[in-house]
Each structure stands twice: as structure tokens, then as C-alpha cells.
Amino acid sequence: MTEKHLSSQFDSELNGVSSRVMELGGMVESQIHTAVYALLQFDPEAADRVMETENRVNAMEIDIDRELSSIIARRQPTARDLRLLIAISKTTANLERVGDEANKIARMVKSIIESGSARALPSNELRIAADLASGLLRTALDAFARLDTAAALSILKDDDLIDKEFDGFVRKLVTYMMEDPRTISASLDLLFLAKAIERIGDHAKNIAEFIIYIVKGADVRHTSMQEIESALK
């Protein structure tokens, strides 16, 4: 993931912590897939599996942060390496938050099932947005492993697709509630789920921004697409 250093031990430490981040990413990806399955099938057992993973995700985030703090204290990294370590820490935090969103989905699925209105809701309408969010996270993790700024730029552009899907779903859900007011409570739960999916895409976008920060040293948060493309030249 990184260029070679004079200290092979430093290289080993950087690669080790980067591998842990990818392991965390894989764990969180699995949470998302299971949470979406639980949503589409209204499967309470799948929702339970998502929630059972939460403690492992949280523990791994803490372990990675401890290792990063130790590396910084012992190695006194150069500017580029410090950017990498900071970005790894922020990426880890974003992955943990993706896990939080997966858990929110799982808990809400359980609530909807218990309300007895599960099958009456158009949950399948969320499939496209969920697939987009999951795909963006996978691309972000792959780009992070390769420090691929071109892939990072593609993620930043594609994030708008999830936002459009979310907006379209909200319009459909409002219409659905107006046609059948009895489903308002459960429909609001589904709206909460849609927002959780949108946030997963936002976290993938954040990771893409960290990649650009590592490679180019440019903080592209809250900047226009034109400014981002200029920073990558």
C-alpha cells in the first residue's frame, strides 16, 4: 500500500495496520449485505446476525486506533506517512459508522416485523440504493488498498446517484402514505432505513476523499468537483 522505507519494520507495521483496516472493511461489508437481506426479506434472524457483529467491529476500531497511536509515537512519521496514518484513522472511524448504519437497519427491520406491517411496505424499492451504497463501499476499499485516486474520483461522482435514488424513494413513500394512512408509522420507519443507506454512501465518499488526501496532500472535503479534478492533475 505504501512506498518502501529505510526501516523494514516500519513498512511491516504500516502494512499490518492497513490489512486490519481491510479486514474491518470486509466485516462491515458483510454487515451491510446481511442487513439489506434482512430488509428485503424481513428476516429477523438475519437482522440478529448483523447486531451480533457490532461488538467485534467496535473492538477492532479500538485496536486499530491503539496501533496507530503507537506507530506515531515510536516512528515520528514524515508528512506523507503522517497523512496516511491520519487517513487510516479516519477511514477506520467511517467504517465503524457504516457498521452503525447496518445495525440501525437491522434494529428497524425487527421493529417493523414486530409491528405486523412488514409485507405491506415497498421495501424492495430500496434495493437499487442499497446496491449502489454497497458497491461504492467496495470500490472505496479497493481504491484505499491501491491508493487509487482515479477510483476515488469516480466514487465522488457516483455518490450523487445514491442521493437521487433516496430523493425518488422519499417521493414514492410520501405518495404511499397518502394513499394508505394506516401505514404512516411503518413508512416513517422505512424512511429512516433509506436515510441509513444514504449515509453508507456518504461514508464511502469520505474514504475516497481520504485517499486523495494521502496521495496528493489536498483536503478536498466541501469542495467542488472542478476543484477536486484540479487537485488531481
What do the predicted segments below correspond to?
Residues 1-233:
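Cytosolic, long alpha-helical scaffolding segments
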